[in-house]
Amino acid sequence: EYAQIINDQSKRHMTLRGLFEFKLDPAQAIPLSEVEPATNIVKRFATGAMSLGSISTEAHTTLAIAMNRIGGKSNTGEGGEDPMRYRQELRAGGSVIETGATLSGVLGRDRVEVDTPLRAGDSLRSKIKQVASARFGVTTEYLNSADQLQIKMAQGAKPGEGGQLPGHKVSTYIAE
């Protein structure tokens, strides 16, 4: 009964979602063989741009790992990216992560609060590199490690105030 009340809430509030219904005709179903495979669809998935300083090393890296595993793209945000996440991979021409590796083993214990086990072949590299007006963390090497560049022209969330982190979030690691 509770689930029904919650599920009908959109209809009662007259939201667009609540007024939308699918009319299915099994006779007009598209054969599964004509549907684009999920492995192709996820290649167009991308995370939002969130800087390393705005979240955590673990969260920022986990987004990159997850998107790389499915074939999508993560975005560095305007704070740049730790060169340890892409330098070795670029030099080797592919992932250098081996079985038994951990996040702190790659980045260093002083840069990780909660260690994360990695899989062989994982990539910590964000494929989308954002460049903002202050160019935090932007180097030639950083730009060369991108599959895609995103040039930020304006601040949407806090117009006129972008790129300012609360003081307690600016650690030595973030300041680098």
Describe each model-derived feature in a short phrase.
Residues 1-176:
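Conserved, well-structured core domains of diverse proteins
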